[in-house]
Regions:
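A nucleotide-sugar donor-handling region in carbohydrate enzymes
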Residues: 131, 137-205, 234-235
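Conserved nucleotide-sugar donor-binding subdomain of glycosyltransferases
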Residues: 67-99, 106-107
Length: 343
């Protein structure tokens, strides 16, 4: 395993895994992934070697869709970080690691820096802002300071967003999975013979509130629309739903996003990027007080309060025209930047 690339993927949700799969598929390198749970399963499904070692504690979101106990989650994240750092240290010590790539896994980044190993950080979050109180935010600010210092010292920081490169930060644009077929063929493959509303919440159970609200809204207006609703709840949930089609886990969810007529989703970055690139009309509802999702939703003209307008939004968006598929994809540039470090 001489000179290999260790690719550490955050297991929090599936968004990190989806973009890392795209980058890895374009790299000519000896890659071993390290992740956990649903993310590890997805990486394995795409044929990559992955060590399923990470176990994270999910956000606590109440039935109304509001993030609870944010400070407690930050403290539990610190414990998770220390466990991940031990795992990363053991793996890096055992292998002749040429490069460490870490998608929002700052434990692996820390180990790489301590061992003077070239490293790449992939992130769309340059700082967090979960907590509101003065006392708790002081702890978060300290963590942000450490995160920023690690990024400053890293060989390269890849940001899957639009922007101007500076210092060691490279803004490569959205990184999304490629479509394997035409939209018409995909609709036939998935059995989409009517207008199709796709509801998805990513890789955790944090979006159950959105599934329930979306189904309720759909049931109240379905007699007025010729459309079916399909719910993809992700690999970590086992729930029964009435009146809609329910799928637990889909390897190629991105192709369902492309094939559907309307997407209703949490405002996670990877999902919003996929919908943007594929031109799919969408409704993005963030978890309340989840700063990153609220920012993503705001960029698309939505807020948490729109959850009470789902009926009107569904009717409006089902009549919206699709945008053209965007040709630009940051995966190629990300691959090129990483490949240059392997030479």
């Amino acid at each position: 395993m001489s000179g290999q690339l260790l690719f550490f993927t955050s297991p929090i949700g599936l968004g990190h895994a989806t973009r890392d799969i795209v980058i890895a598929s374009k790299l000519n390198a000896n890659i071993t992934f390290i992740s956990g749970e649903g993310a590890a399963r997805m990486i394995s499904d795409y044929g990559f070697l992955v060590k399923d070692l990470y176990r994270n504690k999910s956000f606590v979101v109440d039935d109304s869709g509001e993030l609870q106990c944010a400070f407690r989650w930050i403290i539990s994240y610190w414990s998770y970080y220390k466990k991940c750092k031990k795992i990363a240290s053991n793996l890096i010590d055992r292998n002749e690691t040429k490069l460490v790539v870490a998608d929002e896994d700052f434990a692996a980044t820390s180990v790489a820096l301590e061992n003077n190993i070239p490293n790449v950080v992939i992130t769309d979050v340059l700082q967090t802002s979960f907590t509101k109180s003065t006392l708790f935010s002081a702890v978060e600010k300290k963590m942000n300071k450490g995160m920023k210092e690690m990024m400053r010292k890293s060989t390269l920081v890849i940001i899957p967003d639009y922007g101007e490169d500076h210092d060691n930060l490279a803004y490569v644009g959205p990184i999304v999975r490629e479509i394997s077929s035409s939209r018409e063929k995909l609709r036939e493959h998935f059995g989409f013979d009517r207008k199709t509303i796709l509801v998805t919440i990513g890789g955790t159970d944090a979006g159950v509130f959105l599934i329930n609200k979306a189904i309720r809204a759909y049931n109240e207006i379905k007699s007025r629309i010729d459309a079916e609703m399909i719910v993809v709840s992700g690999p970590s949930m086992n729930i029964g739903l009435q009146g809609v089609k329910h799928i637990g886990y889909v390897k190629n969810l991105h192709e369902m996003v492309y094939a559907c007529d309307l997407l209703i989703s949490l405002a996670g970055r990877s999902t919003t990027d996929e919908a943007d690139v594929y031109g799919t009309p969408s409704i993005f509802i963030p978890i309340k007080n989840h700063f990153e999702q609220e920012d993503n939703a705001r960029r698309h003209g939505f807020s948490f309060e729109d959850i009470d307008r789902l009926k009107d939004l569904i009717l409006q968006k089902l009549e919206a025209a699709r945008s053209d598929v965007k040709a630009s994809n940051g995966a190629v540039r990300a691959m090129t930047l990483i490949s240059n470090l392997l030479k």
